[in-house]
Curated annotation (Swiss-Prot):
Role this protein plays: The UvrABC repair system catalyzes the recognition and processing of DNA lesions. UvrA is an ATPase and a DNA-binding protein. A damage recognition complex composed of 2 UvrA and 2 UvrB subunits scans DNA for abnormalities. When the presence of a lesion has been verified by UvrB, the UvrA molecules dissociate.
Keywords: ATP-binding, Cytoplasm, DNA damage, DNA excision, DNA repair, DNA-binding, Excision nuclease, Metal-binding, Nucleotide-binding, Repeat, SOS response, Zinc, Zinc-finger
SUPFAM superfamilies: P-loop containing nucleoside triphosphate hydrolases
Protein name per Swiss-Prot or TrEMBL: UvrABC system protein A
Length: 960
């Protein structure tokens, strides 16, 4: 057997910064590619191996199919042998569709729909009575179980809650030979004159038969049931009385006992409310199909409405002061109409909105109804004055009209700033029609079941009680559901609910969901390529993830993982360590082999870290702060259980806890907006808490997250940190530029003048693909340089502006060493480990971790105040241990300057660096949200209830 059959052989890989490397990877093994950020890991795994696998797959398709997929370029590699079908599971949150949920992405919701369609119990959406579709034999069998000797009356419900005299209905029943009817609860003889108020709603049941039950009446009962069902269009009501029946007195029969009432239907209808329920089909439970979706919100569960707080952000202002943002007072059309409103409804245009009467504000917002306003409006050209007499539509109605009539994206954007998302009032956010939500399994409808966490859902199905028939029907469906739920648990996502919108998932969560889906497919002989699946996972959950990866391998697959996590590296069958540096200094294979073999290689930073030769030292002294404390009281947003949190200012604090325990809710949803609004005079929506103290000790709050630094090809690190402004100014001072009269704007790709007008300075042409992602191709005029020939003719130290943008940040720092303002900003980028990134690299190509560090560099390049609070959300994402050392030096320097750093983090090497740890838990979802432990890492390690404490203890013992 050749090596290609046992191994994946890559020869001459040169993609991006790879240095013509040869790599041999074992198949059917867990292989980890490690190395510094920017060393070429993704270039090897995704841009070379996966890209070639994808290209070969497309090449195998017919010419007809290939025309829809386009041509895929061959990666810059000599050859790849032994390549299996490849599946890439990346960090990207691809589902931006608001209809996509965790349940739909994992297909669990599809099985839920099938389960409810097959064994769900339908109820009337109005009265909640159970509705069963039954045959005549089933109805008779049910009635024969009533104790012998009981008297029953078979009633045909012919009118349900309808106005009218219903004379024709009663007359028809009399002609058909029926003697009695129950009208509005009273039993009446039909031969008497019955007069009903036509303005009131009535319910009429025709008495078809009265039977005393015994073993000998089955035949008569069957005939009467058939007659009743035929007369009432498949509906039947049965009054059951004990042996002590009432007597007939005059026209009304009364019962000595309170009769019980039974309802039957042949057609999934409620006999009591005369409401039909559709046949139970899977589509009835789909919020993506009109058959099941709530008609008000079309199955989204939310609606966009114009928000008064956005239209009038400052209610202390008047109309004349511009209180109503979409209605500027300087526009005469607005002014004359508001003046007419003020005159008619007795308020002044100088009155602050807060002081307007409720009636006046209601008219302004919702319109004057049928009451007309009279006002005059002079035409712009002054030709004549038009006189209007018509009702005022109201601000909300007019904005809806303008928004609906907007023809361009920019016009719609103007009005979208005044919209806010509200829960749909019709379905209360449950997305489905009332008929769909009235179907239950063990008293839970499909939305209530989807609202459970994965962990709670597993428990629900373990304790589900079914009849023998139901169990037989649902057996295979339940197996598919429980298998998929367990896969989600195994990748650390037990805290997620199936109703969670896919667009709100982090990149790591989205990746692990796709991983769980792949495990469910049980494919073999596949090459799986994953990008840091441990991102966002607590150490406890990470152990289960590793077991999942090993299970995927044991199925007969090759699992190739780009990873920095120590646990994953130690269990790998094979490690390929790239380096030795990043960017131009990387791209070589520094070490390859089993973990013990890699540890023997002195040049491998990864190997030395695993061997314990390189460590992040534990601080000798923990800071106690500057004496001031920030306290947030009674936090109860999402799953947080009315906790109060104290953060000592002037310290480095880590927020820890298992996945879903409430870390992001506390820091991002509550603390950051609360501080930003009070310290920075912002207007961010705040999470729920009662009060906050200590904000007066801060003068700035900075949140450094992982969102992109820009969403177009023009956005790049140089523009984001502002260094490109200094570079453009420098180029404008070059003698050639002065001679040509070029200003700094000439060297900008955002404005006309010096940029290539064919691509508008993007360097690429964007091709919109409608329902597919946009495609970018290199501009064939400027060939990606972004500028026209005249601009590129200006040189500084032998380089033009395009050459500079193509430099790595490290190269640029050396190139501009004589220009302090430029060096200071580039130094900040280098200090956070981004020296390998190119100055002009498109923001679209930066990972979340890289984008976060660019933002951090921007803040580092500013003058420190010593009273700033920095908030970080897992800043070690995508970082090698050596990069983490560099990052922690920056963080500790910020705190040494008197600032406060609060960070969500799972990396134990970072957590033990903190002055204080706040550990949330004990579990995720509704089982979390409390403070399990708080104090120094040493103190937290002694608390047995703290999951994080267990792992802190391990790290502290290992390093001491």
């Amino acid at each position: 057997m050749g090596s290609a059959a046992r191994n994946l052989c890559i020869k001459g890989a040169r993609e991006h910064n790879l240095k013509n490397i040869d790599v041999m990877l074992p198949r059917d093994a867990l292989v980890v590619i490690s190395g510094l950020s920017g060393s070429g890991k993704s270039s090897l795994a995704f841009d070379t191996i996966f890209a070639e696998g994808q290209r070969r797959y497309v090449e195998s398709l017919s010419a007809y199919a290939r025309q829809f997929l386009g041509r895929l370029d061959k990666p810059d590699v000599d050859s790849i042998e032994g390549l299996s079908p490849a599946i890439a599971i990346e960090q990207k949150t691809t589902q931006r569709n608001p209809r996509s949920t965790v349940g739909t992405v994992t297909e669990i919701y599809d099985y839920y729909r099938l389960l409810f369609a097959r064994i769900g119990r339908a109820h009337c959406p109005h009265c909640a009575r159970e509705i069963k579709e039954q045959t005549v034999d089933q109805i008779v069998d049910t009635l024969m179980t009533v104790p012998s000797g009981s008297r029953i009356q078979l009633l045909a419900p012919v009118v349900r809650g309808k106005k009218g005299t219903h004379h024709k209905v009663l007359e028809a029943a009399r002609k058909d030979g029926f003697v009695r009817a129950r009208i509005d609860g009273a039993l009446l003889h039909l031969h008497e004159r019955i007069s009903l108020d036509k303005q009131k709603k009535h319910s009429i049941d025709i008495v078809v038969d009265r039977i005393q039950l015994s073993d000998t009446v089955r035949k008569r009962l069957t005939e009467s049931v058939e007659t009743t069902l035929g007369y009432a269009d498949g509906l039947l009501t049965v009054l059951v009385q004990g042996e002590n029946s009432g007597t007939v007195s005059g026209k009304i029969e009364t019962s000595a006992l309170l009769p019980s009432e039974l309802f039957f239907s042949q057609k999934n209808a409620c006999a009591h409310c005369n409401v039909s329920v559709p046949e139970l089909q899977p589509r009835l439970f789909s919020f993506n199909a009109p058959f099941g979706a709530c008609p008000s919100c079309a199955g989204l569960g939310i609606m966009q409405t114009f928000d008064l707080d956005r239209i009038v952000p400052d209610q202390n202002r008047s109309f004349n002061e511009g209180a109503f943002l979409p209605f500027k007072p300087e526009h005469e059309w607005n002014r004359v109409r508001f003046a007419a409103l003020a005159e008619k409804y007795h308020f002044s245009l100088d009155d602050p909105v807060r002081n307007l009467s409720k009636h006046a504000l209601d008219i302004i917002l919702h319109g004057s109804g049928s009451e007309a306003l009279e006002f005059s409006h002079e035409r712009k050209d002054g030709s004549r004055t038009a006189r209007y007499i018509k009702p005022w539509p109201g601000i909300f109605s007019e904005l809806h009209r303008r928004y609906a009539e907007s023809c361009t994206h920019s016009q719609r954007e103007v009005y979208e700033r005044y919209l806010s998302v509200r829960t749909c009032e019709a379905c209360r956010g449950m997305r489905l029609k009332p008929e769909s939500l009235a179907v239950t399994i063990e008293k839970k409808n499909i939305h209530a079941l989807s609202a459970l966490s994965v962990d709670d859902s597993c428990e629900f199905f373990k304790t589900l009680h079914l009849t023998e028939v139901e169990a037989t029907i649902a057996q295979q469906i339940l197996k598919e559901i429980t298998d998929r739920l367990e896969f989600l648990q195994n990748v650390g996502l037990g805290y997620l609910t199936l109703e969670r919108a896919a667009a709100t998932l982090s990149g790591g969560e989205a990746q692990r969901i796709r991983l769980a889906t792949q495990i469910g497919s049980r494919l073999t002989g596949v090459l799986y390529i994953l990008d840091e699946p441990s991102i966002g996972l607590h150490q406890r959950d990470n152990e289960r993830l590793i077991q999942t990866l090993l299970h995927l391998r044991d199925l007969g697959n090759t699992v190739l993982v780009v990873e920095h996590d120590e646990q994953t590296l130690r269990v790998a069958d094979y490690i390929v360590d790239l380096g030795p540096g990043a960017g131009v200094h990387g791209g070589y294979v520094v070490a390859a082999g089993s973990p013990p073999e890699v540890m023997q290689v002195q040049a491998s930073l990864t190997g030395q870290y695993l061997a314990g030769a390189i460590t992040l030292p534990i601080p000798a002294v923990r800071r106690t702060g500057n004496g001031n404390v920030l306290t947030v009281h009674d936090v109860h947003e999402h799953n947080l259980q009315h906790i109060s949190v104290r953060i000592r200012l002037g310290t480095f604090t880590c927020i820890t806890g298992v996945s879903g325990s409430g870390k992001s809710t506390l820091l991002i949803d509550v603390l950051y907006p609360a501080l930003y609004n009070r310290v920075m005079n912002g207007r961010l929506p705040e999470g729920k808490f009662s009060s906050i103290e200590g904000t007066e000790h801060l003068d700035k709050v900075i949140y450094v997250d992982q969102s992109p630094i820009g969403r177009t090809p023009r956005s790049n690190p140089a523009t984001y940190v502002g260094v490109f402004t200094d570079i453009r100014m420098l180029f404008s001072q070059v003698p050639e530029a002065k001679m040509r009269g070029y200003k700094p704007g000439r060297f900008s790709f955002n404005v006309p003048g010096g940029r290539c007008e064919h691509c508008k300075g993007d360097g690429v042409i964007t091709i919109e693909m409608n329902f597919l992602p946009d495609v970018y191709i290199t501009c064939d005029v400027c060939h990606g340089t972004r500028f026209n020939r005249e601009t590129l003719a200006v040189f500084y130290k032998g380089k033009n502006i395009s050459h500079v943008l193509d430099m790595t940040i490290e190269e640029a720092r050396s190139f501009f060493s004589a220009v302090p303002p430029i060096v200071r900003k580039l130094e900040a980028l280098c200090s956070v480990g981004l020296g390998y990134v190119r100055l002009g690299q498109s923001a679209l190509t930066l990972s979340g971790g890289e984008a976060q560090r660019v933002k951090l560099a921007l803040e580092l390049s500013k003058r420190a105040t010593g009273k700033t609070l920095y908030i970080f959300d897992e800043p070690t994402t995508g970082l090698h241990f050596a990069d983490i050392i560099q990052l922690m030096e920056v963080v500790q320097r910020l705190v040494d300057q008197g600032n406060t750093v609060v960070m969500i983090e799972h990396n134990m090497d970072v957590i033990v660096q903190a002055d204080c740890v706040i550990d949330l838990g004990p579990e995720g979802g509704m089982h979390g949200g409390t403070i399990v432990a708080q104090g120094s890492p040493e103190a937290v390690s002694q608390i047995t209830e703290s999951r994080t404490g267990w792992y802190i203890k391990e790290v502290l013992c290992k390093k001491t």
